[in-house]
């Protein structure tokens, strides 16, 4: 018995959660299950590997080589030296081990590490932009379901009104005030309402399936989406991830500029080597140890420096142009959305009055039909008008909330 109670306690919250979803929960699940999210970890791994490899440039670099050499006479051996037993050979086999250690590299390794970090940041921000677009797609599907829910609700209310009207007309038919064609006219409207309801429910199921793919969850037709709270933004300052992406691009260009500067400096290395070789002459030993410092300065970077700097400046201008274009287009979208919000608020005020007047006209029409002073078709027209007015008001309410969230998404607040 205890086991059954425990199972029920575990399953019931899952069932309740499955029957109700919020917009924020859908966004979070969509981000967590989006295939591209795995790229974050891959970018970090690539960055860490690159940084680790760059740091290893400070480790001693060991090389080994074996060679065989043939050469002309190294020494001018005269007859007297030959009589003393001094001879030279024209071949030599040798093996060498050499160790090099960076002492000063002009900042090249540090610049490489900065570039690795900057490149990873650019990739991170680029991925954040694509992930941010995902939120808007989820919002559109979510509000699409809410809009269909409102339409289904009003279609069901229309069916109830038509059902009451049919009972009224059938009673009038028994009293001789109405005929069978009046009953049939109401029946036709009922069938039209059923047909509309089937189409709306099918569209809702399709939207739920698409939303389920984004959040990686199978959504049944029984699931209920909670209406988000209408929000008002206090500021219109833009915090979109695109701006962070452009900033990351500029940081990468600055890191590349520092790398160009590091190529202008000389490098200093310490070295040590050990050589073992066959004797060319008896005056030489078979082995040798050596050590010292090497100062080198490659001026080849000066040849291309001017063009390299110009190239970086052009790329910086491209980033600035892209940022300005994005902000301009974003401002247009924000202005358009704010205009829609203002329009919908005005329409909602008028929608309430339209619904009130339509309901009054319908009530009077129903009384006239009972008195026989108005046709059933006129009454049906007024009933449909009430349904359309109610549906239009609900549509505007949902569109207003959607527009407010769209504005929030456009400026990322």
Roles of regions detected by a PLM:
Residues 1-34, 407, 411-413:
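Bacterial Sec-dependent N-terminal signal peptides
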Residues 20-74:
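Start-of-domain marker
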Residues 25, 49, 130-244, 251, ...:
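Periplasmic alpha-helical coiled-coil/stalk elements that build and connect Gram-negative outer-membrane
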Residues 38, 61-81, 89, 100-129, ...:
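Small/polar (Gly/Ser/Thr/Ala-rich) solvent-exposed segments
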Residues 39-54, 130, 134-153, 171, ...:
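Amphipathic alpha-helical coiled-coil segments
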Residues 92-94, 140, 185, 267, ...:
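Transmembrane beta-barrel architecture of outer-membrane proteins
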Residues 97-99, 258, 293:
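Membrane-embedded beta-strands of outer-membrane beta-barrel proteins
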Residues 232-277:
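Acidic, glycine-rich loop-and-beta core segments that form the ion-binding/anion-interacting portion
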């Amino acid at each position: 018995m205890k086991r059954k109670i425990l199972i029920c306690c575990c399953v019931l919250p899952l069932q309740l959660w499955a029957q109700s979803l919020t917009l924020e929960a859908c966004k979070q699940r969509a981000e967590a299950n989006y295939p591209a999210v795995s790229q974050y970890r891959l970018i970090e791994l690539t960055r860490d590997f690159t940084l680790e490899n760059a740091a290893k440039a400070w480790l001693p670099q060991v090389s080994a080589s074996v060679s065989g050499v043939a050469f002309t006479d190294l020494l001018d051996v005269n007859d007297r030296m030959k009589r003393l037993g001094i001879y030279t050979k024209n071949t030599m086999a040798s093996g060498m081990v050499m160790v090099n250690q960076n002492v000063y590299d002009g900042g090249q390794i540090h610049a490489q590490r900065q570039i690795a970090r900057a490149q990873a940041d650019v990739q991170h921000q680029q991925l954040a932009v694509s992930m941010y677009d995902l939120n808007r797609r989820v919002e559109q599907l979510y509000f699409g379901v809410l809009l269909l829910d409102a339409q289904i609700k009003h279609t069901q209310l229309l069916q109830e009104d038509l059902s009451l009207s049919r009972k009224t007309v059938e009673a009038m038919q028994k009293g001789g005030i109405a005929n069978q064609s009046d009953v049939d006219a109401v029946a036709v409207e009922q069938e039209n309402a059923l047909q509309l309801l089937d189409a709306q429910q099918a569209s809702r199921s399709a939207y739920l399936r698409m939303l389920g793919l984004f959040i990686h969850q199978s959504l049944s037709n029984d699931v209920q989406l909670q209406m988000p709270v209408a929000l008002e933004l206090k500021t219109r300052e833009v915090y979109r991830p695109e701006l962070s992406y452009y900033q990351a691009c500029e940081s990468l260009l600055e890191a590349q500029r520092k790398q160009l500067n590091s190529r202008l400096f000389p490098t200093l290395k310490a070295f040590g080597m050990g050589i073992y070789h066959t004797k060319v002459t008896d005056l030489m030993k078979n082995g040798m140890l050596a050590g010292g410092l090497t100062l080198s300065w490659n001026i080849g970077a000066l040849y291309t420096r001017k063009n390299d700097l110009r190239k970086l400046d052009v790329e910086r201008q491209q980033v600035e142009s892209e940022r300005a274009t994005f902000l301009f287009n974003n401002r247009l979208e924000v202005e358009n959305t704010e205009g829609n919000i203002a329009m919908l608020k005005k329409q909602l005020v008028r929608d309430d009055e339209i619904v009130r007047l339509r309901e009054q006209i319908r009530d009077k029409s129903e009384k006239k039909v009972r008195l026989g002073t108005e046709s059933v078709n006129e009454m049906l027209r007024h009933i449909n008008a009430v349904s359309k007015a109610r549906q239009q008001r609900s549509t505007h309410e949902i569109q207003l909330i959607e527009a407010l969230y769209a504005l929030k998404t456009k400026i990322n607040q």
